[in-house]
């Protein structure tokens, strides 16, 4: 009965959506006939005693029996202000979780990203303060400029490969992350990776907002005087921040809220402005720094010592892994923007080339500015914006104040755009997947913004070492998820997915994995195994008191992302070999050959899904593959 209700609710959404003011109405048919809603017509069918749900814009008002009016004020508040999607009122939370319009495959009309769109996307994303600080981290550890830049090239090349791998599922089947993860973790256990990503998006939002406080501080000093921080009494209770710094953070946080409230399809104008202004500000900053240093920069290490031997090797690895860890959330997010690709190649080579190229250019600017600042002031600033602050401290003229203000304004805008696109929108989309009845993207984004105040990002960002620790934390949890997803899709399933089963929880659904909990225990075990080796090193890195961690554990932790990724992938493959999963096109993935991914046609998906939804179980379903001429049944 619930399946019939859910099927009827989502009838014909592409033609005429349910009006928010009228929503869904229901009535019970206890007579001999039942009205069957099909394209706005009413035909009489066999006798069924059930509720029928229709869009009341399709029928005459006189034929509608409205839902009972609620007398309680709390009920009125609940239905009018808390419930968002009225189409889910007459189905359970479980059924609204399975399918809603935010999660369905992207139809051809909305798949409009060509190769150049992906280039623009990464061009806009690479210019932010966080990327500049990644380069500064290598210099802080003792590398010289070219060694640091080499780690950037290698690190972001690996990051690009991971992004492309993780986006293939979304690109081929036009699905977002909350759905793609169901294939490997299970229909309902997929909530755990989604919650992981929500938490990481909130933490990242807080960190990026704290970074946004730096250009805000420079703008205020440009207007009100370079000693503004000294004139504001410090009553902040943490040694890692001051009242002035928190005030700047709060200003950035408040200014962000109106932009978070803008609809996602309208906020694109902010990204357009960002992509146009940021390169001018970045290269202008670079030229200004080189001019002030008379073209002289420190080409050697910026520390008093140069590491050698194994010490150098592990510092090199740490700098390299910081680049990969910086992409941990974006690797998981890859299907969210991969699903809009016009064709299979649109999201492949552009991302593989653009990510290392654009981020290497940005990091090179950060490295040179930091090296020029060291030549000028004899201080190893790990954030290039600290160099900009020194410009203001040493030369407080009209020209310097104007230049610092403009560059700081553009970088604040860059942080705002990056925070919205990479964090608040991602959090909002994931929370929409978890609670479609109560949360839309706007509410989810506001929740992300509110929680950012509780993260205390000033403690995470107190030094470059704490910064790399924060990156490592993101990496060890998200890398295991990515490893399981890639192993399942590329090796176990060989690119084959039965789309309708990803949205069905009946008995026999491939992705319920034979249990009522919709959980793939193999994925859970592999996920834990991927995290476990990195935990001792993580504890040692964050400086837990009275705990001594061996050097070997720390070095394993320095390799955090690939360790988590490959261990979870290997464990998952071993478990799937001895305990095969349903819905695979091959019986032995180690010996049998074949690749079964196809560019999915989803224009009629909703009708196909409704047909499957009406079935009591899916136990007799088979795996069918397309060989280019016809559909063949595997079993």
Swiss-Prot record:
GO terms for cellular component: fungal-type vacuole; plasma membrane. InterPro entries: NCS1, Pur-cyt_permease, Uracil/uridine/allantoin_perm. GO terms for biological process: allantoin catabolic process; allantoin transport; nucleobase transport; purine nucleobase metabolic process. It is found in: Membrane. Residues 166-174, 220-243, 291-311, 373-401, 465-466, 544-560 are extracellular. Signal peptide: none annotated. Pfam families: Transp_cyt_pur. The chain crosses the membrane at residues 145-165, 175-195, 199-219, 244-264, 270-290, 312-332, 352-372, 402-422, 444-464, 467-487, 523-543, 561-581. One of its GO terms (molecular function) is allantoin:proton symporter activity. It comes from the Eukaryota. Keywords: Membrane, Purine metabolism, Transmembrane, Transmembrane helix, Transport. Residues 1-144, 196-198, 265-269, 333-351, 423-443, 488-522, 582-635 are cytoplasmic. It is a multi-pass membrane protein. Transport of allantoin. NCBIfam families: ncs1. Belongs to the purine-cytosine permease (2.A.39) family. This is Allantoin permease. It comes from Saccharomyces cerevisiae (strain ATCC 204508 / S288c) (Baker's yeast). The lineage of its organism: Eukaryota, Fungi, Dikarya, Ascomycota, Saccharomycotina.
């Amino acid at each position: 009965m619930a399946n019939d209700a859910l099927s009827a609710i989502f009838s014909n959404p592409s033609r005429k959506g349910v009006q928010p003011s009228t929503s869904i109405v229901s009535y019970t048919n206890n007579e001999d006939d039942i009205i069957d809603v099909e394209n706005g017509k009413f035909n009489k069918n066999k006798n069924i005693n059930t509720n029928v749900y229709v869009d009341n814009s399709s029928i005459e008002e006189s034929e509608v029996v409205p839902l009972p009016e609620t007398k309680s004020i709390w009920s009125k508040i609940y239905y009018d202000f808390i419930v968002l999607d009225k189409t889910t009122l007459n189905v359970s939370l479980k059924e609204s979780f399975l399918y809603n319009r935010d999660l369905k495959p992207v139809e051809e009309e909305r798949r409009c990203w060509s190769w150049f769109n992906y280039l623009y996307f990464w061009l806009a994303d690479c210019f932010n303060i966080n990327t500049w600080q990644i380069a500064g981290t290598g210099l802080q550890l003792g590398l010289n400029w070219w060694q640091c830049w080499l780690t950037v090239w290698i690190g972001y090349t690996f990051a690009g490969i991971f992004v492309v791998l993780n986006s293939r599922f979304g690109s081929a089947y036009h699905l977002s992350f909350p759905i793609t993860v169901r294939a490997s973790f299970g229909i309902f256990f997929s909530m755990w990776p989604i919650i992981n990503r929500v938490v990481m998006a909130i933490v990242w939002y807080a960190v990026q907002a704290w970074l946004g406080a730096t250009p805000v501080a420079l703008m205020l000093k440009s207007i009100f005087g370079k000693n503004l921080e000294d004139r504001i009494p410090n009553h902040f209770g943490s040694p890692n921040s001051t009242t002035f710094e928190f005030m700047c953070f709060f200003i950035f946080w408040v200014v962000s809220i109106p932009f978070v409230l803008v609809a996602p399809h309208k906020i694109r104008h902010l990204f357009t402005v960002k992509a146009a202004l940021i390169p001018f500000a970045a290269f202008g900053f670079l030229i200004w720094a080189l001019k002030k240093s008379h073209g002289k920069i420190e080409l050697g290490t910026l520390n008093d010592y140069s590491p050698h031997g194994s010490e150098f090797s592990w510092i090199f690895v740490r700098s390299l892994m910081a680049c990969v860890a910086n992409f941990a959330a974006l690797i998981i997010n890859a299907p969210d923007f991969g699903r809009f690709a016009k064709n299979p190649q649109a999201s492949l080579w552009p991302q593989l080339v653009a990510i290392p190229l654009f981020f290497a250019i940005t990091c090179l600017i950060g490295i040179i500015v930091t090296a020029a600042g060291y030549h000028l002031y004899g201080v190893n600033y790990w954030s290039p914006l600290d160099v900009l602050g020194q410009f203001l401290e040493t030369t407080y003229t009209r020209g310097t104040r104007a230049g610092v203000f403009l560059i700081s304004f553009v970088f604040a805008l860059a942080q705002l755009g990056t925070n919205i696109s990479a964090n608040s929108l991602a959090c909002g989309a994931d929370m929409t997947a978890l609670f479609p009845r109560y949360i839309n993207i706007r509410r989810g984004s506001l929740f992300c913004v509110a929680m950012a105040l509780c993260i205390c990002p000033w403690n995470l960002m107190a030094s470059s070492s704490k910064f790399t620790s924060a990156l490592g934390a993101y990496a060890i949890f998200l890398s295991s998820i990515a490893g399981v997803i890639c192993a399942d899709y590329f090796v176990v399933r060989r690119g084959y997915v039965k789309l309708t089963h990803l949205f069905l929880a009946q008995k026999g659904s491939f992705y319920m994995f034979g249990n009522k909990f919709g959980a793939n225990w193999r994925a859970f075990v592999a996920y834990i195994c991927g995290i476990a080796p990195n935990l001792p090193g993580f504890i040692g890195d964050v400086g837990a008191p009275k705990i001594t961690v061996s050097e070997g554990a720390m070095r394993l932790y320095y390799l955090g992302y690939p360790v988590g990724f490959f261990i979870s992938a290997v464990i998952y493959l071993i478990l799937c070999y001895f305990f095969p999963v349903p819905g695979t096109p091959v019986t032995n993935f180690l010996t049998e050959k074949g690749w079964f991914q196809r560019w999915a046609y989803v224009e009629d998906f909703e009708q196909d899904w409704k047909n499957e939804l009406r079935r009591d179980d899916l136990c007799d379903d088979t795996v069918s593959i397309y060989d280019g001429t016809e559909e063949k049944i595997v079993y």
